[in-house]
Amino acid sequence: METPVRETDLPPVVISGPPKTGGLRDRLLELLPEGGNLNLCLTCGLCSAGCPATGGEDMDPRKFLRLVSLGQEDEAARSPWVWQCTMCQRCIYACPMSINIPQLIYYARESWPRDERPKGIRGSCDQALKTPTNSAMGVRPDDFTFVVEDILDEVRETQDACKDMEISINREGAEYFLNQNSREPATEPDEMVPLWKILKTVGCDWTYSDVGWAAENYCMFLSDDKAWEDVVRNKVEAVERLGCRYWLNTE
Amino acid sequence: MTATYDALVVGAGVAGIRSALDLAGTGQKVALIDHSPHLGGLLVQLDKQFPTDNCGMCKMLPLTERESSSQFCMRKGLFHSNIDILLSTRLESLEGDPGQFHAVLRKHASFVDPTRCIGCGKCAEVCPVEVKSEFNAGLEARGAAHLPVPQAIPNHYVVDLDNCVRCWRCYDACPTKAIDFKFAERESFNILVADPDPQTTADLAEWLKKQKFPIEGPVDGNSVLERAAEGKDVRLLILDMSLSDVSPERVLSRCLELNARLPVILTGTPEQAEAARLLEQGALAFVEKPLDRAKFVPWLDKLYMRIVSDEIIEIDAAAVVLAGGFSCYDPSEVADVLGYGRSPGVVTSLELERLVSSTGPKGRGLLRPDGRPARRIAWLQCVGSRDLKKKADFCSSICCMISIKEANMVRRLTAEQEGGPAETTIFSMDLRVFGKPFQSYLDEAKASGTRFIRSRIHSIIPDPADPGAVRVEYLDDAGVLQVESFDLFVLGVGARPPAGMNELARAAGIETNEWGFCKTMPFEPARTSRLGVFAAGSFSGPRDISESLVMADAAALGASRLVNIYAPLRERRPQPEPEFRDVTRERPRVFVAVCSSCPMVESRLDTDALTRRLRAMSGVTGVALVDRACTSQGWDRIIDKAREVDPNRVVIGACMPYAYVPRLHELGKALNLNPALMDVCDVATLTALGGDDGEGTDSEVFSRLRMSVAKLLGADPRPTAQARPASPVALVAGGGLAGLTAALAVADHGYEVHLVEEREELGGLAMNIRRTLDGEDPVKHVELLIDQAGKHPNIRIHTDSRVALHLGRAGRFFSVVNTPDGPVPVEHGAAVLATGGVESKLYEWGFRVHKNVMTQQELEQRLADGTVDTAGLNAVAMIQCWRSRDEERNYCSRVCCQQAVKNVLELKRRRPELPVFVFYRDIMTYGFMEHFYTEARRTGAQFIRFSPDNPPAMEHRDGKTIVSAFDPVLGRNVEVHADLLALASGIEPADHSEIAEMFGVEMDEHGFLKEAEYKWRPVASTKYGVFVCGLAKGPANMEESIAQAQAAAQRAVRMLHEKHLASGAVVAEVRHSLCSLCGKCIEVCPYEARRLSPTMDKIQVDELLCQGCGSCAAVCPNSATILRGYSDRQVLSVIDAALEETV
């Protein structure tokens, strides 16, 4: 037996004519160079073998792509699996045909009505939009400043090597503008310290800002283009306000 | 001086060797060169090949005229009287036109004098350098002084100058002073410095004091020119770009005009970019100033060694064959995902070959990196193939079979281990088993327990639970993610153009294709873009051995055709056959000559005592010590001394016995004595290896010479069989593409050809094909061939005719052709069977009942003639492997997937939105055809794999065919409501039973004509003198059929060229009175030289086919089979001589 035949209740995919136009697939074919190479799939399974979301919702990247290729794009896009993708890009990184599966997933997510998209992601995006820090956890500017200073004091006191450590917030003209995932200041503040030490060791000239410092961007994961843009713009403005040369994003 | 050859063959791997042997076999002089220091190319590293699981390279050696060539294992080496082999040699330039090429070759020095090297290895022991060993695929280190391959004969150490650190330790360690680093010549290596800055000269004089190079300078441009004009001795010119009185360009070009080989080094600031342009005009190198002493001095010293020891060889040749082979993809660039170079348990397929070889890296073997036995071994296919990202939109064609073979090797090697053979798993996409015997090979591998999983692997990581192993995740065939650990993970690396391809292409003036391999011409698979230059083997694309040899034959044929225009082979006077006297009735008189100047003889051998002891032997009539037997003066002395005693047996004690084979022929002529009554015995190795004090050397050498004397005393002195005259005519059966191609190729060599076609028209199956995958027009090509054949003065065409009778043996056949005008008798020396194949007939599944069901070939025709209206179609389905690769017909028809892809592209060109579904088992678009499969997918056509135990189901409803199949990717059925269904029917052999019986050739299990040996003799039938090609031999596309036809023609020409066919001196005979007709000898004969007589009462030996291997004599229970030259009595007396107490 070469191929174990699995019992399946799913109805067959029926092909009786040219696929309908104007769907997800066409959008990809139009927008990406070479159509994101969508048609080139060798069905080799490499993407699915390397995908952290394989197996969830009985779906994997190869199967997802196959559904789209066979014109079953509505079924594919409707699968809750699209929300399990982490956008890590491991698939396209190793795909011998450079097929842009993450982009396909992005468009599939977009096809969901906003209020039906997963609450967690949506909530995080909304939260980020509400605060000038863009923190998905709602950390406010003054909270952030307090936590950073508090941890800095503690480190200076307890660690000899850090006695003279300086952290600046809102310092204009620093070379680097450092972003920080808001999970750290909100729940694991000690986790910020290792990076500080590295930056100190290499003699980096950097600063935090009390706004636009949150590195995460759930609006991207939500496939909400407008909100994603708003968040990025706010962060860029924060960088430009301080006149930093580099924006160091840790996400 | 310029040497003149008929052909130059570049690359001495199997393809180059085969081309060279082909040409040499038709009396052409060949120069065979290779850039590496050994023969055999990649094959020296591979112990076994698929699908035979053994080696068999020696089967390429000539079967007749055997004495012109060496007759031993080809992994060790090759000698042929018509082939000059130049190793460590590259082609630098190729000027001129077809028929009169002028080639410049550069032979890199090995710095070891082969006449002095005794292979003791002391140089390698002391060498401090450690670089990756090429032979063991980098799995162990070698020194700069090293032995390139362990098995070569003769085998000398070489110094690899690029990696040498110039410590000279090997020079001091060599006991025979074989290593020459050109110390003495340094003092006469005049270096002229033309640099306005006097500091440069002063620096160089100081820095190079130890090297003892005479430095002269600084001089200005005018004085350089003066010196050059006077022809004063300058060995190297250092020319600075800031020279002002004469421009550096002018100095350079004038100097090179006067002495084209003057080495010139340019110096200058980095900004002096014009230097780069000058480099192209012939300067050796550009060195940036300021000069860095630590780098410049060793660099210059190495350059000096190259200049004084490299040899520039100029040759004239009528034609050139390029057989540069291929290289393996280096997976280091994907180390981040596949772990190669990071996890030691990840190896390439070539490395695995070395790990399981008996000559593999010391202390490795089939072990995990932590030293435990490797019990779980996996292979991953398509590493560096079928991958757009790696610019490899092609299939490497050979890796699937290599991995299956390696799995077999591993299972055999580990069969005795506790727990049975190791677990073997192959991860792949399509399994490309498109060669005729490959499907059965795959089936056997599956049956023996190798697991095949259809998944490429994303990443290979160290196993967190077992650091000696690696871990992968993959989708199983049911689409479920699995995690598994393996002890070794083998990357089936794809093919790439050979290293140095660009330089070779530039030197040879040929174009490359978009993947960097040699570009070839449509319908001329061996022709490169340059007339008179041909491509052999895998130089024009990845191929297995069998196909490489076909391409080598085809390339040789192209070269030979060209050579023949300038110096017709038929008109060449053959070497007069020497007549030897009959010494049967004479008492043996043995003459023994011992070379006294082999490196260690003088110090370790008591030559007086040896002479005395040899003289005392019965039958020995003369003994002579000869100085430098390897030189022609030394050889003349042997002849003189031998004439004095008039011997009828001759033993020569010297070095390198194999090198003396052509010399023995000279001696035979001089003494009028058959060389079969002569023997060369290696005394040099014995003296070299006999312990440090040489104790025991005397008796060892004496014992060895005594064995040779005993062997000759027992030799059968009867003259060897008389040569049979060959008839210079060929018969070609079949007038399709292959038959026409073969007939024209033979006829162009001046031989008469009878072309016999059953049907009324020539052309065959190719006339049904409208277009090749590359867009060429086959019908036009075949019509051209028909026209050429019709006009050819040497071709007689018999259409509507059949061969009715065929008798005789190779070289002299007699056939009768029944033509509409009556029977025509033909006497011919060789036959080519190109009797073709047929598209399989389909009867089931609505074929011939429903109008919308047709074969792929019909679809092509109907698309071409407009009887299929693509505008009215809603969906098209295609089913591949409809009648191939099942129990009934267990081979891949090769052409169907190409045909399907071609039809897909045409349908999609006309109707891009039309759904086209191809149901397949494995898409077999091997080689560069993969590109068209990629393009077919790019159009949006869908390819759905089915398993043979669950084929697509069909239902005809309302003029449509509903094809329903399980898609393993989705895990559910796909149903295509097709207006049109195309079935790949496959290729079947024509009915060959009559022709096979008449010509006495065998058919394989499928009904195709069987090759004598699939791998090494791919166009020879099982009957000597009868060759097979095209679809008669097995499924093939047009290019492949053409190459096979040219190969078959090449073999036929080789046979017709031999005005006399003579067997070798060592052949088997049967003493019929002792024979019990048990037939064991017939089974073991690897050359099919034995058969039961038609009267069923005798075992017959075809002495042309018999190669004297002795397998028959070994299995014969009654000693009824004897090997001439190896009688029992003779062999026993040799053993006695070896064991006899030394007095």
Question: Which ranges hold each PLM region?
Answer:
Chain A
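Iron-sulfur-cluster electron-transfer modules
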Residues: 38, 55, 68-249
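Ferredoxin-type iron-sulfur electron-transfer modules and their immediate structural context
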Residues: 1-84
